Amino acid sequence: MAVGILGTKLGMTQIFDQETGMAIPVTVVQAGPCTVTQVKTPDTDGYTAIQVGYHEVKEKALTKAEIGHLKKIDAPPLRHLKEYRLDDSSQYQLGDAIKADIFNPGDLVDVSGKSMGRGFAGYQKRHNFKRGNMTHGSKNHRLPGSTGAGTTPGRVYPGKRMAGQYGATQVTIRHLTVVRVDSDRNLILVKGAIPGKPGTLLNITPAKTVGK
């Protein structure tokens, strides 16, 4: 396991490859800085991990338990806490800062965030169902079709694709390429689109490769 970083989506832009001149669509992420708020060891917690905090806020935005937890290490009030499992946490100390420079251009990362909510959506928008004929006497324009058999089973199976809430769910986009890192301003430029709208909280971790 490896340490990731929490960040905020700022928006999308494009940069140009210096060799080919091609435009590369990128998402700009404000990555950190995060503060190490807890170091977990097998002796005290049964496993190895570190907890990091991100986004300083006023104390009234946190619960008393959260404020007490952070005051143990004299950390400022941090809105978001995230834990990363590690094989060895000895290199981290309470209060250490984790910044954007933990990544380098060319690294592959997984980005998790909450997708944009689109409210109650129908079958075509939510599941890309094919619509019916709009002419020739058809009355089946945007209907779903069959939802199952009759008396047996006598119900709609769970998981049946139907109209409902679309978006506003946790989404992970895997194997995105880090194009550029601005360590002075803690900015990471990631190739392609990532979940959410500007201001969305993101979790950026080194990409997980199956079998490794």
UniProtKB/Swiss-Prot annotation:
Chain intervals for the UniProt region annotation (Disordered): 130-155
Pfam families: Ribosomal_L3
One annotated GO biological process: translation
GO CC aspect terms: cytosolic large ribosomal subunit
The UniProt record lists the keyword Calcium: no
InterPro entries: Ribosomal_uL3, Ribosomal_uL3_bac/org-type, Ribosomal_uL3_CS, Transl_B-barrel_sf
Gene3D superfamilies reported in the protein's UniProt record: 3.30.160.810, Translation factors (2.40.30.10)
UniProtKB keywords: Ribonucleoprotein, Ribosomal protein, RNA-binding, rRNA-binding
Superkingdom of origin: Bacteria
Matching PROSITE patterns: RIBOSOMAL_L3 (PS00474)
MF (Gene Ontology): rRNA binding; structural constituent of ribosome
Role description: One of the primary rRNA binding proteins, it binds directly near the 3'-end of the 23S rRNA, where it nucleates assembly of the 50S subunit.
Family in the record: Belongs to the universal ribosomal protein uL3 family.
Complex and partners: Part of the 50S ribosomal subunit. Forms a cluster with proteins L14 and L19.
Protein name in the entry: Large ribosomal subunit protein uL3
UniProt organism field: Rippkaea orientalis (strain PCC 8801 / RF-1) (Cyanothece sp. (strain PCC 8801))
